[in-house]
A protein has these predicted regions:
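Polybasic/polar functional segments that serve as interface/processing modules
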Residues: 2-164
Length: 164
Protein backbone atom coordinates (compact mmCIF):
# COMPACT_ATOMS: atom_id res chain seq x y z
CA UNK A 1 0.00 0.00 0.00
CA UNK A 2 2.90 2.33 -0.47
CA UNK A 3 2.05 5.67 -1.93
CA UNK A 4 -1.44 5.82 -0.35
CA UNK A 5 -2.51 8.76 1.76
CA UNK A 6 -4.08 8.24 5.20
CA UNK A 7 -7.46 6.54 5.71
CA UNK A 8 -10.64 8.01 4.21
CA UNK A 9 -8.97 10.41 1.83
CA UNK A 10 -9.37 8.08 -1.12
CA UNK A 11 -6.53 9.43 -3.27
CA UNK A 12 -3.06 7.98 -3.73
CA UNK A 13 0.00 9.93 -4.65
CA UNK A 14 -0.65 8.65 -8.19
CA UNK A 15 -4.13 10.23 -8.30
CA UNK A 16 -5.94 6.87 -8.12
CA UNK A 17 -8.32 5.77 -5.44
CA UNK A 18 -6.48 3.47 -3.05
CA UNK A 19 -7.70 0.15 -1.65
CA UNK A 20 -7.85 1.47 1.91
CA UNK A 21 -9.99 4.41 0.88
CA UNK A 22 -12.30 2.17 -1.18
CA UNK A 23 -12.75 -0.13 1.80
CA UNK A 24 -13.43 2.85 4.05
CA UNK A 25 -16.03 4.26 1.65
CA UNK A 26 -17.65 0.85 1.38
CA UNK A 27 -17.77 0.57 5.17
CA UNK A 28 -19.30 4.03 5.54
CA UNK A 29 -21.93 3.21 2.91
CA UNK A 30 -22.77 -0.09 4.64
CA UNK A 31 -22.95 1.67 8.01
CA UNK A 32 -25.32 4.35 6.69
CA UNK A 33 -27.55 1.68 5.13
CA UNK A 34 -27.55 -0.28 8.39
CA UNK A 35 -28.64 2.84 10.27
CA UNK A 36 -31.52 3.43 7.84
CA UNK A 37 -32.75 -0.14 8.17
CA UNK A 38 -32.22 -0.23 11.95
CA UNK A 39 -34.25 2.96 12.34
CA UNK A 40 -37.26 1.29 10.71
CA UNK A 41 -37.18 -1.98 12.65
CA UNK A 42 -40.18 -2.77 14.78
CA UNK A 43 -42.37 -5.52 16.16
CA UNK A 44 -46.01 -5.89 15.10
CA UNK A 45 -48.16 -8.17 17.27
CA UNK A 46 -51.75 -9.09 16.46
CA UNK A 47 -54.28 -11.29 18.20
CA UNK A 48 -57.77 -12.42 17.26
CA UNK A 49 -59.73 -13.37 20.38
CA UNK A 50 -62.90 -15.45 20.37
CA UNK A 51 -65.43 -16.46 23.02
CA UNK A 52 -64.24 -13.77 25.42
CA UNK A 53 -65.50 -14.47 28.94
CA UNK A 54 -64.64 -11.00 30.28
CA UNK A 55 -66.98 -8.54 31.94
CA UNK A 56 -69.27 -7.22 29.18
CA UNK A 57 -68.20 -3.63 29.85
CA UNK A 58 -64.79 -4.30 28.22
CA UNK A 59 -66.64 -5.07 24.97
CA UNK A 60 -69.26 -2.29 25.15
CA UNK A 61 -68.03 0.69 27.18
CA UNK A 62 -65.52 2.91 25.35
CA UNK A 63 -64.61 4.84 28.49
CA UNK A 64 -63.97 1.72 30.58
CA UNK A 65 -61.99 0.07 27.77
CA UNK A 66 -60.02 3.28 27.27
CA UNK A 67 -59.04 3.39 30.93
CA UNK A 68 -58.02 -0.27 30.83
CA UNK A 69 -55.91 0.33 27.70
CA UNK A 70 -54.22 3.38 29.23
CA UNK A 71 -53.39 1.43 32.38
CA UNK A 72 -52.04 -1.53 30.39
CA UNK A 73 -49.84 0.83 28.35
CA UNK A 74 -48.43 2.41 31.53
CA UNK A 75 -47.90 -0.98 33.20
CA UNK A 76 -46.00 -2.23 30.14
CA UNK A 77 -43.64 0.75 30.36
CA UNK A 78 -44.78 2.40 27.13
CA UNK A 79 -45.70 6.07 26.69
CA UNK A 80 -49.14 7.16 25.48
CA UNK A 81 -49.12 10.44 23.55
CA UNK A 82 -52.74 10.41 22.34
CA UNK A 83 -55.88 8.32 22.38
CA UNK A 84 -59.30 7.94 20.78
CA UNK A 85 -62.11 5.65 21.90
CA UNK A 86 -65.26 5.23 19.82
CA UNK A 87 -68.49 3.37 20.63
CA UNK A 88 -70.57 2.06 17.76
CA UNK A 89 -74.37 2.18 18.06
CA UNK A 90 -76.41 -0.96 18.52
CA UNK A 91 -77.90 -2.42 15.36
CA UNK A 92 -80.17 -5.27 14.34
CA UNK A 93 -77.08 -7.50 14.63
CA UNK A 94 -76.62 -6.71 18.31
CA UNK A 95 -74.93 -4.23 20.62
CA UNK A 96 -72.33 -1.89 19.19
CA UNK A 97 -68.68 -2.54 19.80
CA UNK A 98 -65.77 -0.27 20.56
CA UNK A 99 -62.66 0.81 18.70
CA UNK A 100 -59.86 2.01 20.95
CA UNK A 101 -56.66 3.57 19.63
CA UNK A 102 -53.74 4.63 21.79
CA UNK A 103 -50.97 6.48 19.98
CA UNK A 104 -47.67 5.57 21.59
CA UNK A 105 -44.36 7.39 21.48
CA UNK A 106 -43.15 3.96 20.38
CA UNK A 107 -46.04 3.49 17.83
CA UNK A 108 -49.63 2.31 18.54
CA UNK A 109 -52.22 0.05 20.15
CA UNK A 110 -55.58 -0.70 18.47
CA UNK A 111 -58.45 -2.68 19.96
CA UNK A 112 -61.67 -3.57 18.13
CA UNK A 113 -64.52 -5.35 19.93
CA UNK A 114 -67.46 -7.35 18.56
CA UNK A 115 -69.72 -7.92 21.59
CA UNK A 116 -72.33 -9.78 19.52
CA UNK A 117 -69.64 -12.39 18.80
CA UNK A 118 -67.70 -12.08 22.08
CA UNK A 119 -64.74 -11.24 19.85
CA UNK A 120 -61.82 -8.84 19.94
CA UNK A 121 -58.93 -8.02 17.62
CA UNK A 122 -55.76 -6.51 19.04
CA UNK A 123 -52.91 -4.76 17.28
CA UNK A 124 -49.71 -3.66 19.04
CA UNK A 125 -46.86 -2.13 17.06
CA UNK A 126 -43.64 -0.77 18.52
CA UNK A 127 -40.79 0.85 16.65
CA UNK A 128 -37.45 -0.18 18.01
CA UNK A 129 -35.67 3.06 17.24
CA UNK A 130 -33.22 3.88 19.99
CA UNK A 131 -34.16 0.85 22.10
CA UNK A 132 -35.75 -2.57 21.76
CA UNK A 133 -39.35 -2.28 22.99
CA UNK A 134 -40.28 -5.86 22.05
CA UNK A 135 -40.63 -7.11 25.64
CA UNK A 136 -42.92 -4.17 26.42
CA UNK A 137 -45.05 -4.93 23.36
CA UNK A 138 -45.43 -8.52 24.53
CA UNK A 139 -46.30 -7.36 28.06
CA UNK A 140 -48.99 -5.04 26.68
CA UNK A 141 -50.46 -7.78 24.49
CA UNK A 142 -50.43 -10.28 27.37
CA UNK A 143 -52.24 -7.82 29.67
CA UNK A 144 -54.98 -7.18 27.13
CA UNK A 145 -55.47 -10.87 26.32
CA UNK A 146 -55.81 -11.52 30.07
CA UNK A 147 -58.39 -8.72 30.32
CA UNK A 148 -60.63 -10.26 27.65
CA UNK A 149 -60.26 -13.90 28.83
CA UNK A 150 -60.69 -15.59 25.44
CA UNK A 151 -61.45 -19.29 25.11
CA UNK A 152 -59.63 -19.20 21.76
CA UNK A 153 -56.89 -16.90 20.51
CA UNK A 154 -54.79 -16.63 17.39
CA UNK A 155 -51.54 -14.68 17.72
CA UNK A 156 -49.24 -13.34 15.02
CA UNK A 157 -45.84 -11.70 15.26
CA UNK A 158 -44.22 -9.80 12.42
CA UNK A 159 -40.83 -8.12 12.40
CA UNK A 160 -41.20 -4.91 10.40
CA UNK A 161 -38.77 -2.71 8.50
CA UNK A 162 -36.14 -5.25 7.51
CA UNK A 163 -35.28 -4.22 3.98
CA UNK A 164 -32.81 -5.88 1.67
Amino acid sequence: MSGETPYFTGVTSHGQQGRTARRAKSWVKDWKNWLKVRAMQGLHLTADLQQCACDERWLLDAEALGQACAEAVRAAGLQAVGQLFHSFPASSHGPGGVTAVVLLAESHLCVHTWPEQQGVTLDVYVCNFGADHSARAHALMDALVALFQPARASHNELMRGYLN
